[in-house]
Amino acid sequence: ALQTQYPLYEVIAVNDGSSDKTAEILDELALQYKGLRVVHLAENQGKAYALRSGAMVSQYEYLICIDGDALLHPHAVLWMMHHLTEFSAVGAVTGNPRIINRSSILGKLQVGEFSSIIGLIKRAQRTYGRIFTVSGVIAGFRKTALEQVGFWSDDKITEDIDISWKIQLERWDIHYVPRALCYIYMPETLSGLWKQRVRWAQGGVEVLQSYLPKMFNLKSLKMWPVALECAVSMVWAYIVLLIFVLFFLGLFVDVPKEWAIRSLFPQWYGVILAITCLIQFFVSLYIDRRYDDQRFLRNYFWVIWYP
């Protein structure tokens, strides 16, 4: 962050009650680098509280928030600030996380997944004016917008999804900035990946439950496509679960004919769905190839095995 190529900025590092030597290291760095300020919290309060603490002590109108283990591209702030300063209706911007650890199959699969989820879907969502969520690992905010919505909430498991909905329900825009790069580490074990995805799913359900009553007014019409997309995804997941339950149940007991699942192998419609998925991955990787050392064909080989 201290290497960012922007003329005027400060770096605020929030130590969220760490029990290791993080506090000592940050204090030493603060003495070494003039532009670094450190905020120490007495005990771990969660990311939302840490973000609020950093925002409260900041002296500028614009905030660029990254995770402690993320590596910010030197030009990322420049690209994000362009959108925040040039468009007065923009309350937040979200960057483009790129995965560093690709030694395992899970790591390679997530490269394609991130290009699809973070890249292509956010580009598509912008066509109808709203984005489901900023990327928690790299996001920029206008402090005025944050103050209007009461900053980040402590009672939501995914503060990034929550703040995105709060800001957009107050009619602020969120822009996706693909050139604002940030390099991150992702889970490379099934257990770590499972916990992460359960957390993301729970976060989506929480915001849908919390803000559904606010959707029934004219100023929230642009949020309906995002809410509908989220709801359809949930229904899809439960249908897939039901298919598996009915299939395995049918192995032991008689299931009514109209409910019987004879095979888990995809039929012709499953093949069409798989081809559509592969086309989506190809397009997303092709668009993002400029940010990934032109290795999109190598990455595409691995997404073929995406479940």
Language-model segments: which ranges?
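Short, acidic, metal-binding catalytic loop of nucleotide-sugar glycosyltransferases
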Residues: 1-8
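Catalytic donor-sugar/metal-binding loop of nucleotide-sugar-dependent glycosyltransferases
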Residues: 164-182
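Long helical/loop segments within the catalytic core of UDP-sugar-dependent glycosyltransferases
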Residues: 33-40, 48-50, 56, 60-61, ...
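A conserved acidic beta->alpha catalytic loop
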Residues: 15-24, 43
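Acidic helix N-cap motif at the loop->helix transition within catalytic regions
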Residues: 20-28, 51, 75
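Membrane-embedded multi-pass helical conduit in multi-pass membrane proteins
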Residues: 232-307
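Acidic donor-binding loop at a coil-to-helix junction in glycosyltransferase catalytic cores
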Residues: 157-163
